[in-house]
Amino acid sequence: MSDVKYFEDTEFGLIEAVATIDNGDFGTRTIRFETGQLARQADGAVTTYLDDDTMLLATTTASNQPREGFDFFPLTVDVEERMYAAGRIPGSFFRREGRPSTEAILACRLIDRPLRPTFVKGLRNEVQIVVTVMSMNPEDYYDVVAINGASAATRISGLPVSGAVGGVRMALVVDEKHPEGQWVAFPTHAQHEQSVFEIVVAGRLVERKRGNKTFSDVAVMMVEAGASENVVNRVKDGAPAPTEKIVSDGLEAAKPFIDILCRAQEGLAQRVGNAAKEFPLFPPYTDEVYSAVERKVSKKLASLLTLKAKQERDDATNAYMEEIEAELLPKFEASYSSAAEASKEIRAGYNAVMKAIVRRMILTDHFRIDGRGVTDIRDLAVEVELIPRAHGSSLFERGETQILGVTTLDMLKMEQQIDSLAPGDAKRYMHHYNFPPYSTGETGRVGSPKRREIGHGALAERAVLPVIPSREEFPYAIRQVSEALGSNGSTSMGSVCASTLSLYNAGVPLKAPVAGIAMGLVSGEIDGKTEYVALTDILGAEDAFGDMDFKVAGTADFITALQLDTKLDGIPSKVLSDALEQARDARLTILNTMADVINGPDEMSKFAPRITTVKIPVAKIGELIGPKGKNINALTEETGANISIEDDGTVFISAADGASAEAAIEKINALANPQLPKVGERFLGTVVKTTAFGAFVSLLPGRDGLVHISKLGNGKRVEKVDDVVKVGEKIQVEIADIDNRGKISLVPVVEED
């Protein structure tokens, strides 16, 4: 039974809250929050443990003064992965940690997304949350532990937040005892391998009323989910497919664990007893400004919002905002320290009124600002093979969102090497997402990817990974790049669609095509009843105006990835399940459109490398490589092929043409499955070494013979071997003798007239 216990050590000032997570047949996990020992000068510091081995220190600190000129909340979240946590020295040149790993950046986003909405609106003091991974059991994930630790540190810091946030990772584990699957909280990596779907859920406790009774409930704030890499094969073998119902069940299964984690944090905060601190708040506008703007703009602004083209609509609403600003500025200027301050509030009030108008029209009329119905998808356009020398390329357009997908294939030795606390040391399928400023018609910094780009790339990668063929089926490293050339709503899901098209164009035999769609949800009171309207294929503006956005990617049969963020205090199960079904209908429509252009792998590009495999005995690996790589380097030089050897004896051969590959295969087979040369056999060999007594000639990789100096002169006396042959020279030889130790004596072949 899941439970919370508290411990206090008054002598040392330590306070602990221990939450026990009961996974039934899969045992229990323990989350322990401890404060009072480490980082005492931070506003809030909590050491969080998962069982005994995984340990994270989370701190929350706020600046003393608000930042001037900021019109947003300056919250920063950093995750510091210390390699000593895994008993390792960093592999970098300086042997110390450098820039954060991709896993650390994704953990930062997982923390930021549910915690940011809990802070009071109008806060302008800088707040920094730092999570340091100090000890790491290689079987555990630390990211969800970090969510809880960061929330607990913030909760005891005295900062104005609405409550604690609990985070849990759930895996649908399928084994012989649980053929239908069981949801397991805080799964190990071994359980991850047995699962078909994983879901990270973060939420908080809210008070609800039922009649005269008040009770606590869990409001889901964030979801990040994905299918396992081997889900297609597992489903074929009888495991449950991760359908929309499975996802809904996973959310419900997570709620009891979130409840216990939130209660543990709240209990810790009560026992610490830090008083709430007072911070100046800077609301974006006053009620007076909002009312003045609302009275002036409602009717005309509503008509401007019906313009279908994004640029035309934006230009019209911005011009009208400047007109309203000019009218109202004289009235409010005297109430502010400067005209700029008054102008900023009027603009903020204008945007708030515009948001309210759009939301009201959606709820009452099912109106959308581009004229579509709530379930309609924007016009789709699909094209492949755009980039001449790329191995695969595609262009996917959905309305004004435009994504270019480009696929590059290479040898497995080009897979990404990972030096982080995450499990695994290499990644074969890499998805990189770029979002240049021109995609929204703006200027800005270009260069290294920002956190948002890394997050979007990871989401698209997670969506496509379950359908990537295995190494044995397709022995290539695959790099997929998504270029967001135009953005007006969900470039990440557009990247999923473009990736499927591009991968097929490159000849990658995907297990199934994948598509994605972004959904929105708007809710509000209409005639005393709460109404919910789900929107298919949301625009950028609808994303900003809505209460929830979620992105769903998958095949025709099941979901491969899902991301959800909501501002609501909970979503009725039926509303969520209906929205997921609505997303599935849209996904099927997009998949059909894509299939009309390309529905399977094309022939591989002539510019792509041809990779074949040969299996050799493990005992022959060293012989193939040779001393200091002599043999394999010679093979590469002679054939022009690139050769990579796996520990199990699998040899991957990459060549620009079939002849080079065949030559390499022939030489590798000759060495790996050697048949002793026979007396009388002739070879065109290469002189590899000369000595005072003769020349050594390479017949096959690792197989040399000696032409004695007495045999080199065609019956004439030779003083120096180098006078007749030189290293690197080709020479036709015949095997004259093989002694009982296997040493080969050669004689030159003299062509007869």
Curated annotation (Swiss-Prot):
Q: What class of enzyme is it?
A: transferase
Give the catalytic activity.
RNA(n+1) + phosphate = RNA(n) + a ribonucleoside 5'-diphosphate
Domain KH residue range list: 609-668
UniProt keyword annotations, A-Z? Cytoplasm, Magnesium, Metal-binding, Nucleotidyltransferase, RNA-binding, Transferase
Gene3D superfamilies under this entry? GHMP Kinase, N-terminal domain (3.30.230.70), K Homology domain, type 1 (3.30.1370.10), Nucleic acid-binding proteins (2.40.50.140)
The answer to keyword Transferase applying to this record is yes
Name the InterPro entries on file.
ExoRNase_PH_dom1 (IPR001247), ExoRNase_PH_dom2_sf (IPR036345), GPSI/PNP (IPR014069), KH_dom (IPR004087), KH_dom_type_1 (IPR004088), KH_dom_type_1_sf (IPR036612), NA-bd_OB-fold (IPR012340), PNPase (IPR012162)
CDD domains the UniProt entry points to: KH-I_PNPase, RNase_PH_PNPase_2
* Entry similarity comment: Belongs to the polyribonucleotide nucleotidyltransferase family.
Q: Under which name does UniProt file this protein?
A: Polyribonucleotide nucleotidyltransferase
Originating organism: Corynebacterium glutamicum (strain ATCC 13032 / DSM 20300 / JCM 1318 / BCRC 11384 / CCUG 27702 / LMG 3730 / NBRC 12168 / NCIMB 10025 / NRRL B-2784 / 534)
